[in-house]
């Protein structure tokens, strides 16, 4: 009886610690459902129905492993990826890494900020510029939570992630997808045309986000409580739950687009405004409103995460710190310039995703090198199987993103 009580007490303590350590992966997972994912998944679903759902499944599994490695680096070393690169590589190399990471963080923020502004425009009927002003105000308010520590921000970001997931449960109910075809699309790989290959590369490029790789290692580097192995075990649960939710949202986005657009003959739906306007007569005004709200929630939360990632990148690479509100102000400027110049926001959004693809391998390669170093990682070093899987992901991501870049350059 005494042994049972001890085991029960230790079990409760383990669960309590696991819950206390949950949160960082929910911040990271927001990067996987930003407006870039909305645009890519909608286009893929409208064009090819359920045939590219398997790409979302595999991209999400890859992303899970990458985020676990990033989180593990922070737990094992007490330093984030940017700091490790700074400590192990020559200064010119570090400065190059910092510049490209900042450019990629700003490109990411551009897509996320404009995505949220489009969401406000759609649901409130305001101009894109007014939507951008509302986005700026909202992100400043959310970032103010950082003054109270990481936990309040984790709760808000996690809440927004769950809201987007709930919104897409509603969208699935409205669109009523064919479950048998949906399941087949998730399991059986299919690339029927060269455009499908191009869109598959786009889905992968929009899913694995370099700025989140840097950020996640910083979110776990100061975790306390329990042993390193216990913190790592709790983090794996954190990543599994958060990334499963993000994966569901991406699947639901594509499945909704397939059911609502592809099978009703609207295969050319390619941008967010068009998707919103097309949803109204096909499903209902309520479905279109839910879509707009989910776009706002995803855009706001992901642009906040992008700001935090930019801060980590600057602090880690060059040991320089600026207040978050200053960084937020500076990174908003390109979005306002794009809007004031009257450029096509969806095209800018897609171009930013292409730019992002340059940074994926640059973040992945050092992450794999560091997490495979037994002197650095100790008992948390990568196993042989994880190393091999990691390098396969690197090769695949680089190959598909080269395809994406070449296809974009040639106008394929």
UniProtKB/Swiss-Prot annotation:
It is a multi-pass membrane protein. It holds the Pfam family Nramp. GO terms for molecular function: cadmium ion transmembrane transporter activity; manganese ion transmembrane transporter activity; metal ion binding; symporter activity. Its main location: membrane. The keyword ATP-binding does not apply. Residues 40-51, 119-125, 176-196, 259-276, 345-350, 407-412 are periplasmic. Residues 1-19, 72-95, 146-155, 221-238, 298-327, 371-387 are cytoplasmic. InterPro entries: NRAMP_fam. It is found in: Cell inner membrane. The chain crosses the membrane at residues 20-39, 52-71, 96-118, 126-145, 156-175, 197-220, 239-258, 277-297, 328-344, 351-370, 388-406. Keywords: Cell inner membrane, Cell membrane, Ion transport, Membrane, Symport, Transmembrane, Transmembrane helix, Transport. GO terms for biological process: iron ion transmembrane transport. One of its GO terms (cellular component) is plasma membrane. H(+)-stimulated, divalent metal cation uptake system. PANTHER family: NATURAL RESISTANCE-ASSOCIATED MACROPHAGE PROTEIN 2 (PTHR11706:SF33), SOLUTE CARRIER PROTEIN FAMILY 11 MEMBER (PTHR11706). Belongs to the NRAMP family. This is Divalent metal cation transporter MntH. It comes from Escherichia coli O127:H6 (strain E2348/69 / EPEC).
């Amino acid at each position: 009886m005494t042994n049972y009580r001890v085991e029960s007490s230790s079990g409760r303590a383990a669960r309590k610690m696991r819950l206390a350590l949950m949160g960082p992966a929910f911040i990271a997972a927001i990067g996987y459902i930003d407006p870039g994912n909305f645009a890519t998944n909608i286009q893929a679903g409208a064009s090819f129905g359920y045939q590219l759902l398997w790409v979302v499944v595999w991209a999400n599994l890859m992303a899970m492993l990458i985020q676990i490695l990033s989180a593990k680096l922070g737990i094992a070393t007490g330093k984030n990826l940017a700091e490790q690169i700074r400590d192990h590589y020559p200064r010119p190399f570090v400065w190059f890494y910092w510049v490209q990471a900042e450019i990629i963080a700003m490109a990411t923020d551009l897509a996320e900020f404009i995505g949220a502004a489009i969401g406000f425009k759609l649901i409130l009927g305001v101009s894109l510029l007014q939507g951008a002003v509302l986005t700026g105000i909202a992100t400043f308010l959310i970032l103010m939570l950082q003054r109270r520590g990481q936990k309040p921000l984790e709760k808000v970001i996690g809440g927004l992630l769950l809201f987007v997931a709930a919104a897409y449960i509603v969208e699935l109910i409205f669109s009523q997808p064919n479950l048998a075809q949906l399941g087949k699309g998730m399991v059986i790989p299919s690339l029927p045309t060269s455009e499908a290959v191009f869109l598959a590369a786009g889905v992968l490029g929009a899913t694995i986000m370099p700025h989140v790789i840097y950020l996640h290692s910083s979110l776990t580097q100061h975790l306390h409580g329990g042993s390193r192995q216990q913190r790592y075990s709790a983090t794996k649960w954190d990543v599994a739950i958060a990334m499963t939710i993000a994966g569901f949202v991406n699947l639901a986005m594509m499945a909704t687009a397939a059911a609502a657009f592809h099978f009703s003959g609207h295969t050319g739906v390619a941008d967010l405004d068009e998707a919103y306007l097309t949803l109204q007569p096909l499903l209902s005004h309520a479905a279109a409103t839910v879509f707009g709200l989910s776009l706002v929630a995803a855009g706001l939360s992901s642009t906040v995460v992008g700001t935090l990632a930019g801060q980590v990148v600057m602090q880690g690479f060059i040991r320089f710190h600026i207040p978050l509100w200053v960084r937020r102000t500076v990174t908003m400027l390109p979005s306002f310039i794009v809007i004031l110049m009257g450029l096509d926001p969806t095209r800018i959004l897609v171009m930013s995703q292409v730019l992002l693809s340059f940074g994926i391998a640059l973040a992945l390669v050092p992450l794999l090198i560091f997490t495979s170093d037994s002197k650095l990682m100790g008992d948390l070093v990568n196993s042989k199987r994880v190393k091999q899987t990691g390098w396969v992901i690197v090769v695949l991501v680089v190959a598909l993103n080269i395809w994406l870049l070449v296809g974009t350059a040639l106008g394929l």
